[in-house]
C-alpha cells in the first residue's frame, strides 16, 4: 500500500489559509453590520486551547482509561476549562443575537468563524505532535 506523506510546509500553508478564513468570517461579521461585539468571540476561541496545552505538556506517555483508578485532576480541569471556553465562544454570539446587539447573519458568521479558528489551532497541534523516532521527510 502506498503511503501518502505531506511536507510540513504544505501543512503550515493549508492551516494558515484555514485560519485566515476563520478570521475573515469573524471580521466580516463585524464590519458588514457595523457592530464590533463579535470580536470578543475571537478572544475566547484563541484562549480555549491554552488550558489543555498547559496541563498536558508534561504527560506525553499518559494514557487515559476510564476504567483505571488513577486520576489526573490537572487534565480534568484543563478539559473542563477548554470545554467551558468553547461553549462560551459558541453561546456568546447567540446571547448577542438574543439581546438584539447583532443580526442573525452576523451570529452565524461569527460562530462558524470562531469554530474554524479553534479547530485550526487544534489541527495545528495535532499535525506537529510527532515522536522523536518518526521521520517526517519526503525524500528519506
Swiss-Prot record:
GO cellular component: endosome; late endosome; Vps55/Vps68 complex
Regions of this protein lying in the Lumenal compartment: 33-37, 98-107
Compartments (UniProt record): Endosome membrane
Residues bearing the modification Phosphoserine: 137
Family annotation (Pfam families): Vps55
Any one Gene Ontology BP term: protein transport
Keywords for this protein: Endosome, Membrane, Phosphoprotein, Protein transport, Transmembrane, Transmembrane helix, Transport
Membrane topology: Multi-pass membrane protein
Ranges that cross the membrane: 12-32, 38-58, 77-97, 108-128
InterPro entries: Vps55/LEPROT (IPR007262)
Segments on the Cytoplasmic side according to the record's topology features: 1-11, 59-76, 129-140
Function (record text): Involved in protein transport from endosomes to the vacuole.
Family: Belongs to the OB-RGRP/VPS55 family.
Name recorded for this polypeptide: Vacuolar protein sorting-associated protein 55
Organism of this sequence: Saccharomyces cerevisiae (strain ATCC 204508 / S288c)
Gene this chain is encoded by: VPS55
